[in-house]
Structure formats: structure tokens, C-alpha cells
Amino acid sequence: MAIITREKEQLLMERAGKAYDQAIQLLKMMDKAVQDLAFKNDPENRYDTWITLARFDNILQMILLHMAVSDGGISPRERKFIQQIVKYGDLLDYLRQQDKEEDGLTWDKLAKMNASKQAMVVQLLTPRLERLCDAFVKPLAILDGMVKDEDFLKLLLGNVSAICACMSYMDGVSSKKEANACYDIGYQLLEGRWKKYMK
């Protein structure tokens, strides 16, 4: 593992933060458009956009976790990045709420596991996001399919890729395994189902 300076770490966090903010602005705009269409005659059924943004945060953290375990264990800098990049939702908090377990998996517990156990846990957690991913993707993908002069999926994936690229250097070196993990899990959770719902 190579060493990165605090200045480099800060620069990576700033770049990732800009990409994250762009993704959030895009999602806010899309969510408003979806709700304007869906609840035009039923304004009382509108929901807080925070729900959509929290779902995105959970999906993003899962993508980043897959990257972190792809080339070994989750480094302290990777953990910090994964926890600090999001503003609306936390994956492990969400899973504990789903389980109704106060003493479920936490970031501290995950950090104390060895690399192989971390990888196993991340693999086991992924299927538990199926419903959340569908709830996040479906309305946005349908909107994307209706708007012919803009490719919202491409814009969102561009921001996610930029965040992943920054995270890949947090342990000092960017590996092909991390890039592949980002693409594979990103396709599974976002891109593949988005394209399915756009049809």
C-alpha cells in the first residue's frame, strides 16, 4: 500500500465532493420533475426529496464498499471516504433500521474484521438493497426515457465514476480490481436496471 499525503487526501475528497454535489443537484431536479408529473392531481401524496437522496447515498456507499474490498481490506482512509462522502443516508444505519437491531453491523465492527470477512459481509449485504434500488431507479429511469434531449443516466454515472476514481486512490494506489468492482456493482445496482425501466 502506497502512502498518500494529507494534502492529496484532501484534494481527492474535494474532487469527489464536487462530483457528489453535481449528482445531488441532478437527482433533486429529476425527483421534482417525477413528482410534478406523478402527483399533479394529488399534491398531498408528494414525498420529501430526502428519501430519493438517501437511497442514492446507500447505493453509492455499497458501490464504494465493493471497491474497497476488491483489492484487500477496507483501509482507514477508504472507510473515512465512504462515510464522509454522503450527506443524506448511511448504508449501515439503513440496514440496522431494516433489521430493527440497535446492535447490528456498524462501521467500527466492519473495520475490525479481516479482509476476507469484510469481502464476505459486503457480498451478503448487496442483495438486501434490491427493493431500495428498484424504488430509487424506476421513477428516474422512466423520466429519463421520456426526455429525449438529455441522457440523465450518463450524467449520473459520470458523477458516480468520478467519485469512484477519487476513492480508488485513497489507499495510495488505484487498481484494475477497484475499477472493475465499481463498474460491475454499478451496473448491477444502477445502470442495468435503469436501462430495463427505460424501455
Residue ranges, per PLM feature:
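Small-residue-enriched hydrophobic alpha-helices in membranes
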Residues: 2-69, 73-199
